[in-house]
């Protein structure tokens, strides 16, 4: 259950990072 939530959250963050081009903040993901 928890792992699935983390995966969804990570996907949202990746999409946001791609949209906003926050390379430094998102390279850690």
UniProtKB/Swiss-Prot annotation:
Its main location: secreted. It comes from the Eukaryota. Expressed by the venom gland. GO terms for cellular component: extracellular region. The keyword Amino-acid biosynthesis does not apply. Keywords: Disulfide bond, Secreted. It is found in: Secreted. There are 6 heterodimeric myrmexins which consist of a small subunit (SS1 or SS2 or SS3) disulfide-linked to a larger, quite structurally unrelated subunit (LS1 or LS2). MALDI experiments give a mass of 7090 Da for U1-PSDTX-Pt1c heterodimer (SS2+LS2). Heterodimer composed of subunit SS2 and subunit LS1 (U1-PSDTX-Pt1e), and heterodimer composed of subunit SS2 and LS2 (U1-PSDTX-Pt1c); disulfide-linked. Belongs to the myrmexin family. This heterodimer may have anti-inflammatory properties, since the myrmexin complex (composed of 6 SS-LS heterodimers) inhibits carrageenin-induced edema in a dose-dependent manner (after subcutaneous injection into rats). This is U1-pseudomyrmecitoxin-Pt1 subunit SS2. It comes from Pseudomyrmex triplarinus.
